[in-house]
């Protein structure tokens, strides 16, 4: 590109589609990779939540849905359940959406995301180095256990 030149980008794709989101937008399934131990967040059909290192595990495919600005719900695609944080800080998967299923999603300065409970606002979704979830009251800012990298889960 020559100095002083201006490049313009098309406002709409040539096929006339909306083009509102680039490829890989939030509607595509994701895998949440935890910085602590290299586990992917897994939601089981029986409601259990943990982490696994196996990239091909079908239960790590997650649907992140924006509920309002900065707030998401996280649904296990295969399990058909929603990630929830209970009043004692346990993570589990609920068959239906409740007020315990909403999380503040924040992009941190290190480019990892954190998911903080909207209902229990000082607690985060977190995985221990063993792959087990970490209780909400034991989580806090600055911990590796709360850092997740959203990755594409397209087949």
From Swiss-Prot:
PTM remark: Phosphorylation at Tyr-82 regulates FGF2 unconventional secretion.
Segments of this protein annotated with the region Disordered: 1-20
Spans annotated as Heparin-binding: 128-144
Cited SMART domains: FGF (SM00442)
Any one of the GO CC terms: extracellular space
One GO biological process term: positive regulation of lens fiber cell differentiation
Subcellular location: Secreted; Nucleus
Keywords, sorted A to Z: Angiogenesis, Developmental protein, Differentiation, Growth factor, Heparin-binding, Isopeptide bond, Mitogen, Nucleus, Phosphoprotein, Secreted, Ubl conjugation
Chief location bin: secreted
UniProt entry tagged with the keyword Protein transport: no
Positions that bind heparin: 36
Residues that bear Phosphotyrosine: 82
Location in chain, cross-link Glycyl lysine isopeptide (Lys-Gly) (interchain with G-Cter in SUMO1): 95
GO molecular function: fibroblast growth factor receptor binding; growth factor activity; heparin binding; integrin binding
PANTHER family named among the record's database cross-references: FIBROBLAST GROWTH FACTOR
Biological role: Acts as a ligand for FGFR1, FGFR2, FGFR3 and FGFR4. Also acts as an integrin ligand which is required for FGF2 signaling. Binds to integrin ITGAV:ITGB3. Plays an important role in the regulation of cell survival, cell division, cell differentiation and cell migration. Functions as a potent mitogen in vitro. Can induce angiogenesis. Mediates phosphorylation of ERK1/2 and thereby promotes retinal lens fiber differentiation.
Oligomer and partners: Monomer. Homodimer. Interacts with FGFR1, FGFR2, FGFR3 and FGFR4. Affinity between fibroblast growth factors (FGFs) and their receptors is increased by heparan sulfate glycosaminoglycans that function as coreceptors. Interacts with CSPG4, FGFBP1 and TEC. Found in a complex with FGFBP1, FGF1 and FGF2. Interacts with FGFBP3. Interacts with integrin ITGAV:ITGB3; the interaction is required for FGF2 signaling. Interacts with SNORC (via the extracellular domain). Interacts with glypican GPC3.
Protein name: Fibroblast growth factor 2
């Amino acid at each position: 590109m020559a100095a002083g030149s201006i490049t313009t980008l098309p406002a709409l794709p040539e096929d006339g589609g909306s083009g509102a989101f680039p490829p890989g937008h939030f509607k595509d399934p994701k895998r949440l990779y935890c910085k602590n131990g290299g586990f992917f967040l897994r939601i089981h059909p029986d409601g259990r939540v943990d982490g696994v290192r196996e990239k091909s595990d079908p239960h790590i495919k997650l649907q992140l849905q924006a509920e309002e600005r900065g707030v998401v719900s996280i649904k296990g695609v295969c399990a058909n359940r929603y990630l929830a944080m209970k009043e004692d800080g346990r993570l589990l998967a609920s068959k239906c959406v409740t007020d315990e299923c909403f999380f503040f999603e924040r992009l941190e300065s290190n480019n990892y995301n954190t998911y903080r409970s909207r209902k229990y606002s000082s607690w985060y979704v977190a995985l221990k180095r063993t792959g087990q979830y970490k209780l909400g009251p034991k989580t806090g800012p600055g911990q590796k256990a709360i850092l997740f990298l959203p990755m594409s889960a397209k087949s």
